[in-house]
Curated annotation (Swiss-Prot):
Residues 125-134 have a biased composition (Pro residues). Residues 77-140 are annotated as: Disordered. This is Uncharacterized protein slr1353.
Amino acid sequence: MPMSSLISLFRQHYPQGSLCCDLLEIDRGLYIVQASITLEGIVVASALAAQSPLEAAEDLAKERAIASLDLTHISSTVPQSSPTAIVEDMEAKPSPPPSSPKKESKSPKQNHKVVTPPAIVNPTPVTPAHPPTPVVEKSPEVEAAIAPEPTLTPAPISFPPSPDPVLSLEEPTPPPAMVNSTFNQPEESAPIDSELQLDFATPELPLAVEAKPDSPEPDMAVSGATELPAGPMDFSEIIARSNLELKRLGWTSDQGRNYLLQTYGKRSRQLLSDEQLIEFLAYLEQQPDPN
C-alpha cells in the first residue's frame, strides 16, 4: 500500500494521533530512524528503519509503525456509514444560534464538511481498551548497530593477609643504681669508659647462670685487691678503677658484657649492686697481665 494511503488511513482511524520520526544515529552511511505513534500521550506503536537516504529511512519507519497497528483489518470490521445517515444525524441536532458574524461565515464550511464523502468525514475514533503493545521491527543492520557492547567485569583482586604487628619486647631501662657514679669521674677515665660503654637498650635475656666450681683463690690476692676505705665509698672511683683494669687486660665491651651475663645475669655495671660491683673489681685485679 502506498505511503499516502497509509497516512490517510491512519488519520481516518486516529484523528487525534501523532506520527513522528527521530534520527537515532548514522552508522556506516545508514540513517537509523525510529517512528513512533502516540495516542493521547501514550506510545502505541514504534518501528525502526535503516536506509542510506534519510527520507527513505523515515518513510520505511512510518510504514512499519502504521502497519503494526493493522488498520486494514480494523477498517474492514467497522461498518461504513452512508452519507445520507450522516446528513440526517447532523440535521437532527439543533444548530447553535449565531452569536457573531464570524460564526455565521463559518457555517457554510460546516455544512460543506457534512456532505463530504465518508473517506474524508472523521468518524468516532475507536479507542482500544488496552493500547496495543509497541511492536518494534528491527532489521539485521539496525540490530548490529544497536547491539550493546559486552561489559567486561574486572577480575577480583585478592590481597595477601597483612601480617600481625610485631610487638616490641623491649623493656624499659631501669635507672642506674648510683646516680653519683656519672659525676666526679676523673678526666683520664672518660675515654676508657666511652669505649667500654655497654648497650642498655637491648632487653635482658634470661640466661642460665652456670655455677662455677669453687676454686680456691689465694687469700693474699683478695686481701690485697679489695682494700677499700672504711668510710663512705665513692662508686665513681670503683668504676674508674675497673675501667683501668679492663684496659690493662685488653678486654673488649663484648667480653665484659658476656662475663657480666654469665656471672650476674646483667649486661651492664650500672645494674650491679654495691657488693657485685666490688666483687667484679676484685676479679679484674686478680687477673695477670696478658703477654
